[in-house]
């Protein structure tokens, strides 16, 4: 568990935070440049020193301004991966990985190297590596120090799109197989969507929202970040069944289900899906003989006018689903809070 209750002033920028983060999964730190994202993880890592408050990791006090406690970075058991890999140029990859490696990680070396796909790189110098390869080595080096917490400061920011696509699957694999909590700084919605379990939104050094990804994603705090044509719902689902005759998989959403193209995931596996509001249409009665496979019973929570369109907030199985319709459709269907209807979903994408 990471307890953050401190304030810090750097120049004209002030960061104030009072949150407790669980000791598992990935928490994305999100916001514009200057919002306080890097300042936050620098304070946690010990690179900067808050003037007030405390930082406590798993019961160990890292900072306590009142008591004059401020552990040095090497005593915090916190790994840090920077935007640039910062590898030692005169050491081969193997030497970079073993630098600072904890004794407890010696037996984990081969497993971690395989997990990150860097076996072929062990005898190469950093100068011969691509940007994505360097970042994989940097992540491996940080993990081999046996940290209780891993900080990643926009690790994909300096990479071009092909290299980002190369590294993203390795980060996803780490989230599944390495039981170390991570704080992931980013201003990329795509990275957050594919990696984060929770999101903390910072603005001018203040926490504007903090919670599960699907909750924060659907909140008004994210509206400025989401283009109107990309308003969407993020939903947690589980694999229910695989169709015996067609290449389709059913996902459980409350007591209803969604059909998607066949997945290789086992039954009961937890997944996260994204549904664009523009891919959801509404009808008052269940349609007959339709090509749309996913028709869910839903209740209208509210509706909002938005630049000539209407955003309809629906409840399906205790979760929020958004639909975008025209004012004409709203009036003809008499959309109002409490109305029960059917949501036809044309497309579903798997995000994690």
From Swiss-Prot:
Domain Mop: 289-352
Compartmental location: Cell inner membrane
Domain ABC transporter: 1-229
EC number per UniProt: 7.3.2.5
Enzyme class (EC, first level): translocase
Binding site for ATP: 31-38
The protein's assembly and partners: The complex is composed of two ATP-binding proteins (ModC), two transmembrane proteins (ModB) and a solute-binding protein (ModA).
Function: Part of the ABC transporter complex ModABC involved in molybdenum import. Responsible for energy coupling to the transport system.
Protein name from the UniProt record: Molybdenum import ATP-binding protein ModC
Species: Escherichia coli O6:H1 (strain CFT073 / ATCC 700928 / UPEC)
GN (gene name): modC
């Amino acid at each position: 568990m990471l307890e953050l209750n401190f304030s810090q002033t750097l120049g004209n920028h002030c960061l104030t935070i009072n949150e407790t983060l669980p000791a598992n999964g990935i928490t994305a730190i999100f916001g514009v440049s200057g919002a306080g994202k890097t300042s936050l993880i620098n304070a946690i890592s010990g690179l900067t020193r808050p003037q007030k408050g405390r930082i406590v990791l798993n019961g160990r006090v890292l900072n306590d301004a009142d008591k004059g406690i401020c552990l040095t970075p090497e005593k915090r058991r916190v790994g840090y991966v920077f935007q640039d890999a910062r590898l030692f140029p005169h050491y081969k990859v193997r030497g970079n990985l073993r630098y600072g490696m904890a004794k407890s990680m010696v037996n984990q070396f081969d497993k971690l190297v395989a997990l990150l796909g860097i076996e072929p790189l062990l005898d190469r110098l950093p100068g011969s590596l691509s940007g994505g390869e360097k970042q994989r080595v940097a992540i491996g080096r940080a993990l081999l120090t046996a940290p209780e917490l891993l900080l990643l400061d926009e690790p994909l920011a300096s990479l071009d799109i092909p290299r980002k696509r190369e590294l993203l699957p390795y980060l996803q694999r780490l989230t599944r197989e390495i039981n170390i909590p991570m704080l992931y700084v980013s201003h990329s919605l795509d990275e957050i969507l594919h990696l984060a379990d929770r999101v903390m939104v910072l603005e001018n050094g203040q926490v504007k929202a903090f919670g599960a990804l699907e909750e924060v994603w659907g909140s008004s705090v994210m509206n400025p970040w989401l283009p109107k044509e990309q308003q969407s719902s993020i939903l947690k689902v589980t694999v229910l069944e695989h169709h015996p005759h067609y290449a389709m998989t059913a996902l459980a959403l409350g007591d209803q289900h969604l059909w998607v193209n066949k997945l290789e995931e086992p039954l009961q596996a937890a997944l996260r899906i994204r549904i664009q509001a523009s891919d959801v249409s509404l009808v008052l009665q269940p349609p007959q003989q339709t090509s749309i496979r996913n028709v869910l019973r839903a209740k209208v929570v509210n509706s909002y006018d938005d630049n000539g369109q209407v955003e309809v907030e629906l409840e399906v199985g205790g979760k929020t689903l958004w639909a975008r319709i025209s004012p004409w459709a709203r009036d003809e269907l008499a959309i109002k809070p409490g109305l029960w209807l059917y949501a036809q979903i044309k497309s579903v994408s798997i995000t994690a």
